From Swiss-Prot:
Organism taxonomic ancestry: Bacteria, Pseudomonadati, Pseudomonadota, Gammaproteobacteria, Enterobacterales
Pfam families named in the record: Beta-lactamase2 (PF13354)
Family to which the UniProt record says this protein belongs: Belongs to the class-A beta-lactamase family.
EC number(s) per entry: 3.5.2.6
Known catalytic reactions: a beta-lactam + H2O = a substituted beta-amino acid
Source organism (scientific name): Klebsiella oxytoca
Chain residues that bind substrate: K236, T237, G238
Misc. remarks from the entry: In strain KH11 OXY-2 is known as OXY-2a.
Record's keyword terms, sorted: Antibiotic resistance, Hydrolase, Signal
Keyword flag Repeat: no
The protein, known as: Beta-lactamase OXY-2
Amino acid sequence: MIKSSWRKIAMLAAAVPLLLASGALWASTDAIHQKLTDLEKRSGGRLGVALINTADNSQILYRGDERFAMCSTSKVMAAAAVLKQSESNKEVVNKRLEINAADLVVWSPITEKHLQSGMTLAELSAATLQYSDNTAMNLIIGYLGGPEKVTAFARSIGDATFRLDRTEPTLNTAIPGDERDTSTPLAMAESLRKLTLGDALGEQQRAQLVTWLKGNTTGGQSIRAGLPESWVVGDKTGAGDYGTTNDIAVIWPEDHAPLVLVTYFTQPQQDAKNRKEVLAAAAKIVTEGL
């Protein structure tokens, strides 16, 4: 059964599917559930949504505990792992890595310009988060010691769901039922909150991650498109086979505590086109009553 609920994080997961977590709902939970259901049916795919309202720790979930291919949204965890190392060694982010022609993979708009000069880990992190540069992601993974080290970092911050198994671009195959390189909307939302608003990173490192996310250049048609223009958004998009279209975001509405929103979407046809408008619509549905 699809879960679509407001609830306190501390409440038992077995609570009723549509549960009032605080004194009042932003909008009717029945209406939110129905709108997300209708959106999913119209889209012809499978939609996953997790929203955390940090004002009262309430949540709204739609397939929140189902696995989805993360695609490039996993880059947040990799960059955060680098930042974590810089807490004990500030020079880590200044370490320069060589970039060879053999390293380049599809969609590397930044790294392909630095074959002679190389790039620092800070520059690679910015490139992979703000331009979704795939070679930058692979170089970061290589520096960390492989995909399993990114997963180990996720475990260290309390995420038992995240798993990174491959590198770019194969981590984007998004084969239905394949658990490689997947997480759930709720697990990713909780981790994103810890990394950007919590204490999983030191203050300086947390601020740097937020700055990178706010400077993302690829999310204008996804979550951001479903929100008021005055709201500040830091996000990371992702895309893969089976029309997989993802976006994870930290949102700062006007006169309200931050929100954390994860939207994952995938389709049954391997060659299906990306559907960023579905993510924008989902973002509007879950925030329009705020």
